[in-house]
Amino acid sequence: MFKEYKIYKFFEQVKQETYKVVWPTRKELVASTLVVVVAVFIFSLTCLVLDYSIHNIMQLLLNIGK
């Protein structure tokens, strides 16, 4: 009985807390999403350039002895 009450109390508190959440407006959500997409794109390009550079340097070093 007590355990069931604790579970009920927990979910009741979760419900109360969700009313306190300040949800973003659609404009804020779109802006934040755009920032994340651009940041991921820039990070991906950086990784691509670094990977390509390291690959070419390794190929150059491995082909020196041939």
Swiss-Prot record:
Coarse class of the protein's main subcellular location: membrane
Keywords: Cell inner membrane, Cell membrane, Membrane, Protein transport, Translocation, Transmembrane, Transmembrane helix, Transport
GO cellular component, as recorded: plasma membrane
InterPro entries reported for this sequence: SecE_bac (IPR005807), SecE_sf (IPR038379), Translocase_SecE/Sec61-g (IPR001901)
Coiled-coil intervals: none
Subcellular location field: Cell inner membrane
Transmembrane domains' residue ranges: 29-49
Similarity annotation: Belongs to the SecE/SEC61-gamma family.
Protein name according to UniProt: Protein translocase subunit SecE
Gene that this polypeptide is encoded by: secE
Organism, scientific name: Rickettsia rickettsii
Keyword Protein transport: yes
A biological process term (GO) from this entry: protein secretion
Recorded topology in the membrane: Single-pass membrane protein
Described purpose of this protein according to its UniProt entry: Essential subunit of the Sec protein translocation channel SecYEG. Clamps together the 2 halves of SecY. May contact the channel plug during translocation.
Subunit structure, as described in the record: Component of the Sec protein translocase complex. Heterotrimer consisting of SecY, SecE and SecG subunits. The heterotrimers can form oligomers, although 1 heterotrimer is thought to be able to translocate proteins. Interacts with the ribosome. Interacts with SecDF, and other proteins may be involved. Interacts with SecA.
Single GO MF annotation: protein transmembrane transporter activity
